[in-house]
């Protein structure tokens, strides 16, 4: 990850501010945290996927140490970054061209002009429990997500106003990958700037097929306007992210990939 960040940054692509370190030097990461009071994420610098060894929303030195120990089980080189506001988008690039984009859409509430977000969350959780679904906690991710929208649990959204209440999946749901369960096709929302960023990333890595992960609050504007970043690249991207089993809809990029393979 640090090498990819370096390659991208040298070519003008936005990546997270970060610091690499090893477990013995975890206090360096604690110093980094002081510059990012809204929280950081610690992760292995190499060799993992699906959120393995990743700890989000770190706020204290002791949490940095604990997260570093966990990450070190997967890789001796560690990485700390600030939490980035927004949802995660996977842009799939094939032969230098963006072919599909999906979003890991966080849960949302709709305001009624009277109720606080805390009250709306309580009602939503009652509905979720009645259906045997996991309720949403007003945890650090919820507070962080509300904060970057200028909201809190005591805010009263306008009638019809949609409020994002979670950016990262609940880690207790072990069957769910952190930030990597994509459930909405958003190819039509991707602005030219993000498209060019994804295609440039694929070119830098000299990869015919790559999934470029962005974190942004708005995919319709460039990253320098939204504060977003390229968070990760996957040179063996899973097509299951682009397939909606609930609707039995076929993944749009699959025929393109097969055609590209069979035409060579």
How would you describe each model-predicted region?
Residues 86-88, 95-99, 207-209, 223, ...:
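Coil-to-beta-strand transition motifs
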Residues 70, 74, 125-220:
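A long amphipathic alpha-helix within ATP-dependent nucleotide-binding catalytic cores
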Residues 180-189, 203-207, 216-264:
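C-terminal active-site "lid" helix and adjoining low-complexity regulatory extension at the edge
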């Amino acid at each position: 990850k640090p090498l990819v960040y370096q390659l991208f940054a040298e070519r003008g692509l936005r990546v997270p501010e970060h610091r690499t370190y090893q477990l013995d030097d975890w206090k360096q990461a604690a110093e980094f945290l002081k510059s990012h009071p809204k929280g950081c994420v610690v992760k292995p610098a190499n060799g993992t996927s699906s959120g393995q060894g990743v700890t989000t929303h770190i706020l204290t030195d002791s949490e940095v140490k604990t997260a570093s120990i966990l990450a070190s089980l997967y890789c001796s080189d560690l990485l700390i970054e600030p939490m980035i506001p927004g949802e995660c988008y996977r842009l799939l690039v094939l032969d230098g061209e963006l072919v599909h984009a999906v979003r890991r859409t966080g849960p949302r509430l709709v305001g009624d002009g009277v109720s606080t977000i805390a009250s709306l969350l309580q009602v939503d959780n009652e509905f979720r429990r009645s259906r045997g679904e996991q309720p949403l906690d007003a945890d650090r991710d919820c507070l962080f997500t509300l904060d970057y929208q200028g909201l809190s649990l005591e805010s009263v959204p306008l009638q019809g106003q949609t409020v994002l209440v979670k950016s990262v999946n609940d880690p207790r749901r072990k069957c769910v990958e952190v930030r990597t369960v994509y459930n909405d096709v958003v190819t039509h929302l991707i602005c030219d700037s993000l498209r060019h960023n994804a295609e440039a990333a694929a070119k830098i890595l000299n990869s015919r097929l790559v999934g470029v992960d962005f974190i942004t609050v708005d995919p319709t504007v460039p990253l320098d306007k939204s504060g977003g970043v390229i968070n990760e690249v996957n040179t063996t991207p899973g097509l299951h992210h682009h397939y909606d089993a609930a609707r039995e809809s076929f993944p749009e990029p699959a025929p393109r990939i097969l055609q590209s393979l069979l035409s060579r």
